[in-house]
Amino acid sequence: MPYSSLHPSIPQPRGLRAQVAALVLLGACLVALWGLGELPEYTLRWLVLHLASQQIGLLVKGLCSLAEELCHVHSRYQSSYWRAARACLGCPIRCGALLLLSCYFYFSIRDKAGLPLPWMLALLGLSQALNILLGLQHLAPAEVSAICEKRNFNVAHGLAWSYYIGYLRLILPGLRARIQAYNQRHKNVLGGIGNHRLHILFPLDCGVPDDLSVADPNIRFLHELPQQSADRAGIKGRVYTNSIYELLENGQPAGVCVLGYATPLQTLFAMSQDGRAGFSREDRLEQAKLFCRTLEDILADAPEAQNNCRLIVYQEPTEGGSFSLSQEILRHLRQEEREVTMGSAETSVVPTSSTLSQEPELLISGMEQPLPLRSDIF
């Protein structure tokens, strides 16, 4: 399933454009240095000195961070000082190698530059102290967002996995059996194409009313599917249920489907309304989009979700625009009908004249008894 197929506003994963821009910058700087006419040895000397200063400065910054982490070594690092040091300074082998190389080039080039050692060390300490106290090297919001997405630190990532493991993975495997049981008692109400799926509504503004008729009066509650129960987290016979809704168009019934909102969106909305969460409306919109994308990725690889659910992602227009939720759902239902019809047309095999003109062949197996026609007996 391609990215942003559900809604055009859902962002794609970040690529390598920052590295490409850095490569272009590298080429431009090399051309500029070549145009200035400086000797390569002179440029290399100061470049190595600058890189060595950066590495020593990062070591000083890590030591300052270690002073704080040592106060939490028992609660955060299971009483392991080694883990606390690695969290602040990184891999010891890499850190030691960079430190040795940096010190070697730093002290050898410093002598040629004629700069006193105490002055340069004091300058390094001063610069790092100002960076920490004044926050001069804070990450940009885009960098923080990229790190959180890459390391799966987002609120949306946890909500998507919780929704899948705690709900969808439990109800989707038995959904078709429950729909069949419902159809037997209600004259095949859900017998249409696409009606065997769970349709999950995803409003990107996270506005999730408890009653769907409040969102659109053309959505009318019809029945409940047969309940499903399971022992879950110490709760015996926990009940899971799904609702069936009838969709009206021009006052007449136009469709029936199993429908419901993605409940974690209520959590995102409540967080944006509670000042203690520190969650702005912009954060809510970003996390809602990432939640939808993450859930889409999860369901794409989940065998129990294949053809059993459909995500309906929409964003209501601002004031002055017209939007009908019932029409959006009907559009998806009709699209499902077209997809199923086209799929069945492609899979149907029409025998060609050359095939029909061949002489019939008898395929005789070496087994003494004929095999049954049903393969699921084995």
Curated annotation (Swiss-Prot):
The modification Phosphoserine is found at S354, S357, S365. There is a cross-link at K150, K236 (Glycyl lysine isopeptide (Lys-Gly) (interchain with G-Cter in ubiquitin)). It catalyses: H(+)(in) = H(+)(out). A motif (pLxIS motif) lies at residues 362-365. The keyword Transmembrane helix applies. GO terms for biological process: activation of innate immune response; autophagosome assembly; cGAS/STING signaling pathway; defense response to virus; innate immune response; positive regulation of interferon-beta production; positive regulation of macroautophagy; positive regulation of type I interferon production. This is Stimulator of interferon genes protein. It comes from Sus scrofa (Pig). The lineage of its organism: Eukaryota, Metazoa, Chordata, Craniata, Vertebrata. The gene is STING1.
